[in-house]
Amino acid sequence: MQENLVIVESPAKAKTIEKFLGKDFVVKSSFGHIRDLSKKDLGVNLDKDYEPVYEIPSDKRKVVEELSSLAKKTKTVWLASDEDREGEAIAWHLAEVLGLPIDQTKRIVFHEITKPAILAAIESPRTIDMNLVNAQQARRVLDRLVGFELSPLLWKKVRPQLSAGRVQSVAVRLLVEREREIIAFRSTPYYRVVAQFYAAADPDKTHFKAELSTRFDTREEAETFLRSCIDARFTVAKAEEKPAQRYPAPPFTTSTLQQEAGRKLGMSVSQTMSVAQHLYEQGLITYMRTDSVNLSKQAIGQCKEEIIKLFGEKYSSAHNYKTKTKGAQEAHEAIRPSYIERQTIEGTPAEKKLYDLIWKRTVASQMVPAELDRTTIVIDISGSDAQFVATGEVIRFDGFLKLYSESTDEEPGEEGSGILPKMAQGESVNPAQITATERFTAPPARYNEASLVKRLEELGIGRPSTYAPTITTIINRGYVVKQNKEGQKRSYVQLTLTGSKIAEKRLTETYGKEKNRLQPTDIGMVVNDYLESQFEPIMDYNFTANVEKEFDRIADGEITWNSMIDDFYGPFHKMVDHATTTQTTKNNQIRILGTDPTTGHTVKARIGRYGPMVEIEGNEGEKSRFASLKKGQLIESLTLEEALALFSLPRNLGPYEGEDLVIGIGKFGPYVRHGKSFASLARTDDPYTIGYDRAAELVREQQARAAAANTPLKTFAEEPELLIKNGRYGPYIAYKGKNYRIPKGTKPEEITLEACMKIIQTSKK
């Protein structure tokens, strides 16, 4: 009989831990959860106090059999799943399935996979914490009840094959509300005035920039102001210089890591968590699901040593950060490198980048603040109540900025000057030029993954372990899309006063460009509206946040999980019964856009079997005409003109080499048809606007590819039927009506007839 069996969640983690324990320990993986709620039915026994009905999935039976066999041959079993609620539940399921006594089985937890941490955990085991298990069990049961009862309703009332979840539905609501703010927004122009001044007494005429505190609604107002400045006097009303400090951000929590990795590295939330998981399992960083910003004394000491070594003692300053997040869970420390002295690692490019981000953020959190000088100069204008304001900021000592600067979700604005000249109150300044530029109010920005996580955290919705799955789920369900927008061109006016003359320029700019922004789909908006109308309490942000607090109370042992579920399920089930019997019509999902000027028939938009579409009704006895919406279009904001444009396909652009160029959209996307051949449009080509020259170019490219595919790379005089060709997946042998793949790494121009025949013979066996 062996001495010890340690069971962890992942094979990578098992491999790392096995290095630290001696020959008396065998380390095996459960590959995550080994049990889940039954999928055959509800999986919850409503008549037995919401008792869960668990089953072992078929793909986990072999794992369970192996672990069960090993456990029977082992004196001591150690359950070493992750230290959060999900990990505690995995430990409990293992104990139940393997027949281990709950109150005696050794449970060990560690925040980092290092030898000292593992050995310390072995020295101080505990038993399974049933409060944590019950908190996870409550979440799982509650989410199953909600999904099981809501999904059939959506099938019946909205569209088949839809589903809903408690947290996911609230996340979609956030996106829908933001989208409707954008749809309702009407951009208005205004004029922003900026001047370049210099001190009247300055022989060098050193310029500094100042902005007018007032904005103008119209060009006329802006031009009138500029004319008033021709003979005006400009005097310094206030010149103020103040020292300031900028403090480092605390070490990463799960949500701040997801946000910063999104902003700095362009990683999605799920990618960030996947990469962080790999780093953790290799023993390179601490546990990545945490809402704590605390660092251990040992980590703070290691940071100090590293800072002094790299930058000198004047850059070091220990900080003890306190976690402010309500309902912070069990994890004891922020995300940090396991070994602070290890500045770089080996690994994939993504692993290297994320580790570098974590290392810099951790070390910077223990550095001194940056010291700044902030200067403000206020300039009066004779004959006007408006003032120009110049701001400047100079870094006197970089402090933590030497290593790391936190990014934000804010749109980049106009920055103040760096160094401003020394000025005194009452001093005269002269304008080199004053410019009034037409600007436009902007709608609220769509959420990206990072800003959505931030908002969910602010509202108290979800926990470190749920942010990534929530976003992945709403995208996979088709309720939300992540997309880029190229932006549009617009012109704007710029008026510049130099001396006594005002010059006008008309310039162009791109606006509305977006990258990786989350937008609700039509079906996402319809489902959201239905759930809000029938299940208002469930969709309420405060209600959802309070449910999270109830889970926390279960974890703290303050309430029982069954009673918490009962308090929720009773009112919820009544709402389901009411919604089931309430007559709702699908007509509210149809939007009348207007009348087709050609036929005089009604044009409407709705969700059809294959997604959002527009319809022009036919005469009695005639079929209606249908067209799908373009990517990024929404039923709610679609105009009649945009809808009619969707019926412009197929478009005949005219003849080319004796055959018409016809643009259309087929099963595999937009195309140009030329006779019997088809060429796909590029992603940047719009089928509704593509011109003749571009379509002809695509046809020529397709013809060239077809010609190249038909031209052999090599032939053999001894065997004319055998040809070496280049296909879609690389070079291949064509022989007597059959094709044979050439092994990877073989140069087709150098292959011999003998080698070809050998490949053919081998393939036939």
Where are these regions (language model features)?
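Intrinsically disordered, low-complexity regulatory segments
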Residues: 1-140, 149, 319, 406-409, ...
